Amino acid sequence: MNNIWWQTKGQGNVHLVLLHGWGLNAEVWRCIDEELSSHFTLHLVDLPGFGRSRGFGAMSLADMAEVVLRQAPDKAIWLGWSLGGLVASQIALTHPERVQAIVTVASSPCFSARDEWPGIKPDVLAGFQQQLSDDFQRTVERFLALQTMGTETARQDARALKKTVLALPMPKVDVLNGGLEILKTVDLRQPLQNVSMPFLRLYGYLDGLVPRKVVPMLDKLWPHSESYIFAKAAHAPFISHPDEFCHLLVALKQRV
């Protein structure tokens, strides 16, 4: 069985695992890893099939979560950005004893728009899947541009994301397609009503992929969770607002 790429740094008494989003890899955290590793034992992970975690094909969300768990510390705060938020949520649902707290960043329990539920239109996700087969580098770049649109530092932030993608070999098309399939089909809104560990949800006010309208809806559905909106961020608040982002995580550490 293949192992995934996993790097541990820092000596904090609380473990923090960072899970990246679709099409990316753990290099995306380099803007905050020094700061966080001074407070936590930090675990940087390339999800199966992404970055340096080669030798994996497309996977279901449940299988992806199991592969990640194999190398994880016994207990940690799990932070997932975007698609990574679904992986962290899945782990909280199936292995709650391994999760000290869960943090989702610019993530939704249901990325796809449904009846009376704001999200990405399913035909947009299907379009991305179609375009992947035609020109996947350009498709990934378009997806990255969407993530930073509207922020004061949009161009700079998009460059940072693109650099992360290009730093390592591109994931295979079937892996990228599998990730989009998870975004298109998974719905964890009801199951996550039952988690009892501390649950922090972070959002960007300008996010074009996870509409801010979901925030009050989830506040109501999950009264045990807390939400925070970065007023001038889009889909990658840790890149546009690194200090504020780290401050929230250090504050969470005091509470777990």
Curated annotation (Swiss-Prot):
Keyword terms of this UniProt record: Biotin biosynthesis, Cytoplasm, Hydrolase, Serine esterase
Cell compartment(s), UniProt: Cytoplasm
Pathway: Cofactor biosynthesis; biotin biosynthesis
Keyword Transmembrane belongs to the record: no
Record's protein name: Pimeloyl-[acyl-carrier protein] methyl ester esterase
Pfam families: Abhydrolase_1 (PF00561)
EC number: 3.1.1.85
Family: Belongs to the AB hydrolase superfamily. Carboxylesterase BioH family.
GO terms for biological process, alphabetical: biotin biosynthetic process
Lineage: Bacteria, Pseudomonadati, Pseudomonadota, Gammaproteobacteria, Enterobacterales
Subunit text: Monomer.
Positions of the catalytic residues: S82, D207, H235
Domain of life: Bacteria
InterPro entries linked to this entry: AB_hydrolase_1, AB_hydrolase_fold, BioH, Carboxylesterase_BioH
Reactions it catalyzes: 6-carboxyhexanoyl-[ACP] methyl ester + H2O = 6-carboxyhexanoyl-[ACP] + methanol + H(+)
Disulphides: none
UniProt domain AB hydrolase-1: residue ranges: 15-242
Any single GO CC term annotated in Swiss-Prot or TrEMBL for this entry: cytoplasm
Annotated binding of substrate, by residue: W22, S82, L83, F143, L144, A145, L146, Q147, H235
Species the sequence originates in: Escherichia fergusonii (strain ATCC 35469 / DSM 13698 / CCUG 18766 / IAM 14443 / JCM 21226 / LMG 7866 / NBRC 102419 / NCTC 12128 / CDC 0568-73)
Function noted in UniProt: The physiological role of BioH is to remove the methyl group introduced by BioC when the pimeloyl moiety is complete. It allows to synthesize pimeloyl-ACP via the fatty acid synthetic pathway through the hydrolysis of the ester bonds of pimeloyl-ACP esters.
One Gene Ontology term of the molecular function aspect: pimelyl-[acyl-carrier protein] methyl ester esterase activity
